[in-house]
Each structure stands twice: as C-alpha cells, then as structure tokens.
UniProtKB/Swiss-Prot annotation:
The keyword Zinc does not apply. Could be involved in insertion of integral membrane proteins into the membrane. Its main location: membrane. This is Putative membrane protein insertion efficiency factor. The keyword Cell cycle does not apply. Pfam families: YidD (PF01809). GO terms for cellular component: plasma membrane. Belongs to the UPF0161 family.
Length: 103
C-alpha cells in the first residue's frame, strides 16, 4: 500500500520530468547551445525537479530561466543540494521510492 501511495505522490514529478525530457530531445536541439549558464537551463530544470520535487524544483527552474538573458554574465550555477535523499533515480531519470524494483 505504501508503495502505491508513493507512486501516486511521485506521478506529477515524473510527468514533469518526462515533459522536460521531451523538450530537451525535440525543442532544445533546434535552438542550439544558447544558454549562458552551466548546466543549461533545461538540464538545471530537470535536475531541480528530480532533486526537490515539482513545486520547489519548478520554482528553481523558473527563477533560473528568468535569470538567463542576453545580458546575464552566466557561469556555473548548480542546483542546490538537498539535505536528505528520500528517493532514487532510475536510469531514465524518473524518481522512485528507494525500495522500488527490489525484491
């Protein structure tokens, strides 16, 4: 029961991860390497949502996109680290409970 509840709670986060992944594969290559920051804004957004969830990670991603403009200095801007890791990432980037897929 707990695994099902965890999967339901993580569904919006994983849906956002899928949308960002599609953007990175389809739209981002059309623009080329135009981001002034490292990692790129889409990579930052993906990691922020994976690490902090849809609300806080989405907020971090929006703030990052707002700071990325032609007059920005740019540079290295990593996603703030989370204190405690609650979930693990699959090889496809989706977030699952630590015990998901084991035993």
């Amino acid at each position: 029961m707990k695994r099902v509840l965890t999967s339901v709670v993580l569904a919006p986060r994983n849906a956002a991860i899928a949308v960002i992944g599609l953007y990175r594969r389809i739209v981002s290559p059309l623009y080329g390497d135009v981001c002034r920051y490292y990692p790129s804004c889409s990579a930052y957004g993906l990691e922020a949502v994976q690490e902090h969830g849809l609300i806080r990670g989405g907020g971090l991603a929006v703030w990052r996109v707002c700071r990325c403009h032609p007059w920005a200095e740019g540079g290295i801007d990593d996603v703030p680290a989370r204190q405690v890791q609650q979930y693990r990432r699959t090889r496809y980037g989706f977030v699952v409970a630590p015990s998901h897929g084991k035993g």
